[in-house]
Amino acid sequence: MSNSAVSSADSIKLTEYSHGAGCGCKISPKVLTTILASQLPVFTDPNLLVGNQSRDDAAVYKLNDEIGIISTTDFFMPIVDDPFTFGRIAATNAISDIYAMGGTPMMAIAILGWPVNKLPAEIAQQVVDGGRQACMEAGIMLAGGHSIDAPEPIFGLAVTGQIALTDLKQNDTAKADDRLYLTKPIGIGILTTAQKQKKLKDEDSQIAVNAMCQLNSIGAKIAKIKGVNALTDVTGFGLAGHLLEVCQGAKLTAKLNLDAVPLLPRALDYLAQGCIPGGTHRNYDSYGEHLPTLTDHQKAILCDPQTSGGLLVAVSSEAEAELVALLNAHQIEPICIGSLETPTSTANVVLC
């Protein structure tokens, strides 16, 4: 390691080594559309049930008439300073895509980029151990991985899962009159930006961390409810962005009750201090034309990029009570934030 490398692990603040943080690093939806617009002939496989033709959380491949294999990957730059916690959050976030399809994870492979001439290998080891801890909590092995020398720290997973095809849930299959439920509060981008701006109080340091380290394993149980018509997780594109994917995929309009959207404790206090991540502005610039007129305050909430955010569930009114009972049984507050309806205008989202 060069003389410029940091020698004291206690003095290292990982967020100072990255230009972005967590899922706020994601390329904006508008730019991503350009990147994915391939000029090559379309290759099809009848066994690929979910691929990049839709904007879903993971790919699903039909193994036989009963079982599908789920494949996903997710990685990002540090969103917290502590290496172990960073690894745990990154892994929890990556595994979430399996749960968001209604599946269960089977194994994971680590993805590591590390500035070897700036940060000690021992710090990278703590990051990987954090990822291993999240995998253990999900009941899977961290079975291998790949690493490169990179200018900024990067960590994540490629995760393989399985799904009973009868339980497969997608983000574009919602139906009119479905009710919308959210399983985690919004505000992770606001609180982590407060940390990066050195405004986060010590007593608030675990609020976002605790939310980001919570596995979305409830998704595998939610998927068994027949009246759940669509399922996705809320991550870097914010609540509005992922809700738009649900609406546009199913050609529906969402009636969103903004007052019902749950917020992390102290999120509004830090928002008032100007703790708005750059990803919020990129998100709004990408899809704001599909939203109703919003105040700056409303934009900051709806477009706030989440890292390891909660699940967004579209459920029929007939199955709503079953979903509520399931969430209550797992100590998850059931919060209905709106509903879906047949469009009467070009608006994808309206506030009610």
From Swiss-Prot:
NCBIfam families: PRK00943.1, selD. Synthesizes selenophosphate from selenide and ATP. Homodimer. GO terms for molecular function: ATP binding; magnesium ion binding; selenide, water dikinase activity. Transmembrane segments: none annotated. Binds 1 Mg(2+) ion per monomer. This is Selenide, water dikinase. GO terms for cellular component: cytoplasm. Mg(2+) binds at D57, D97, D233. CDD domains: SelD. Belongs to the selenophosphate synthase 1 family. Class I subfamily. Pfam families: AIRS (PF00586), AIRS_C (PF02769). One of its GO terms (biological process) is selenocysteine biosynthetic process. Keywords: ATP-binding, Kinase, Magnesium, Metal-binding, Nucleotide-binding, Selenium, Transferase. Disulfide bonds: none annotated. Its EC number is 2.7.9.3. Its cofactor is Mg(2+). The record marks K26 as: Important for catalytic activity. InterPro entries: PurM-like_C_dom, PurM-like_C_sf, PurM-like_N, PurM-like_N_sf, SelD_I, SPS/SelD. It catalyses: hydrogenselenide + ATP + H2O = selenophosphate + AMP + phosphate + 2 H(+). ATP binds at K26, S54, R55, D56, D74, D97, G145, H146, S147. HAMAP family: SelD. The active site is at C23.
